[in-house]
Amino acid sequence: MIVDLNADLGEGCANDQALLQLVSSANIACGFHAGDAQTMRQSVRWALQYGVAIGAHPSFPDRENFGRTRMQLPAETVYAQVVYQLGALAAIARAEGGVMVHVKPHGMLYNQAAVEPELAQAIARAVKAVDPTLRLVGLAGSELIRAGEEQGLVTRQEVFADRGYQADGTLVPRGQPGALITSDELALAQTLEMVRHHRVRTLSGTWAAVQAETVCLHGDGEHALEYARTLRERFAVEGISVSAQ
C-alpha cells in the first residue's frame, strides 16, 4: 500500500525544513495568504534537496486573515488569480531546476471549492490551462475532485490527520468544537482508519467514506514534527509506503 504525505509550507512556520524530511509532497504558499518570492524560492530549494514533490498552494487574496475569510468572487476572477499564483511558483521551480507537479488550494478557497461546483470548476480550468499534467488535490469526495475529473486532470483525494469530520464528509469548520484533533494518539488512529479502511468516524458518531490518496500534515501544529515521525514509523510497521506516486 502506498500513500502520499503532504504538508503546507512557506507560511512562516519554523518547522518547514525539518518537516520536508518526513513528507513526500509540499504545498507552497504563493503569496496571496502567506509567503513571497523569497519564501517560495527557499521552499522549492528545500523540496529539491529532500526529493519532495513541489506543489502550489493558491489562496483567495487574504493575507490579513491567512486565507480563511469566506469570499464570493466571480468565477473568472478566481480563475485569473489561480493562474497567476501557479505561474509564479512554476517559474520559480523551473529557475531552480525543478518542476511543479501538483496544486492544492488553501484555506477557505479549498473549503468552498469542496462544496461549490462553479468555484471548483474555475480552479480546475485554471490548473488545466497552466499545465494539464498537473495533479489537483482536493478534499476526498468533494466538488473539487469532481471538477478535476471532468476537466481530465489527475486528481488526488485528500484526508486530514488532525481535523474533525462532519457526517457529509466535510471538515468541521475551524473555531467550532471538534474541528481540531490535538491528541497525537487520536490523530494516528484516525489516519490509519482512513488509509487502511477508507472511512472516518464523524462527530455524530457515524462513519463517512473517504478515499485517502494523500494525507495532510499541518506543520504549525503543537507537536507537528513529533507526530509526523510517529506516523512514518507506524506506517513502516503497517507496511504502508510513503510516496508522491
Curated annotation (Swiss-Prot):
Tell me which domain of life the UniProt entry assigns to the organism this sequence originates from.
Bacteria
Record bears the keyword Magnesium: no
Q: Which UniProt keywords apply?
A: ATP-binding, Hydrolase, Nucleotide-binding
Subunit composition and interactions = Forms a complex composed of PxpA, PxpB and PxpC.
Q: Which Pfam families match?
A: LamB_YcsF
CDD domains referenced in this protein's UniProt entry, alphabetically: LamB_YcsF_YbgL_like
Q: Which reaction does it catalyse?
A: 5-oxo-L-proline + ATP + 2 H2O = L-glutamate + ADP + phosphate + H(+)
Q: Which family does it belong to?
A: Belongs to the LamB/PxpA family.
Q: What is its EC number?
A: 3.5.2.9
Is the Protein biosynthesis keyword given for this protein? Answer: no
| MF-aspect GO terms | 5-oxoprolinase (ATP-hydrolyzing) activity; ATP binding
Q: What is this protein called?
A: 5-oxoprolinase subunit A
Q: Name one GO biological process term.
A: carbohydrate metabolic process
| Entry-linked InterPro entries | Glyco_hydro/deAcase_b/a-brl (IPR011330), LamB/YcsF/PxpA-like (IPR005501)
What the protein does comes down to: Catalyzes the cleavage of 5-oxoproline to form L-glutamate coupled to the hydrolysis of ATP to ADP and inorganic phosphate.
